[in-house]
Amino acid sequence: MSRRVMFKFRLYLAGDALNSAQALANLSAFCREHLPDRHEIEVVDVFREPKRALADSIFMTPTVIVLAPPPVRRIVGTLSHTLTMLLALGLDPHVP
């Protein structure tokens, strides 16, 4: 995958729950390290926007939807495993 591709994430969280805070911190750190200047993160709180969560079929939090590049993917959990994230995004884990 080209190193210039823009990644767009929509992260669904449940208020200020610990696992929600961890997911946001982990996704932000991952993007800073592996996708500098090539990412956008939209955060949606399911308590504040439940209809939006239902429209996107979000039934567990935290869940991140990778909107771009295609295909659309979902990753559930705190996003703490860097290798899993790299592979899910189609990035080479051996490229710094």
Where are these predicted regions, by residue range?
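Thioredoxin-like thiol-disulfide oxidoreductase module
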Residues: 44-60, 89-93
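Local sequence-structure signature of Cys/Sec-based thiol-disulfide redox active-site neighborhoods
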Residues: 2-33
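Solvent-exposed alpha-helical segments within well-ordered globular domains of core cellular machineries
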Residues: 22-25, 29, 51, 83, ...
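Ser/Thr/Gly-rich flexible loops in soluble cytosolic domains mediating phosphotransfer, phosphorylation
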Residues: 79-96
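Domain-scale activation on soluble regions of proteins
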Residues: 7, 33-37, 41, 52, ...
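A short, hydrophobic beta-strand/beta-hairpin element that forms part of a small beta-sheet core
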Residues: 62-73
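A structural boundary/capping signal
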Residues: 2-3, 7, 40, 45, ...
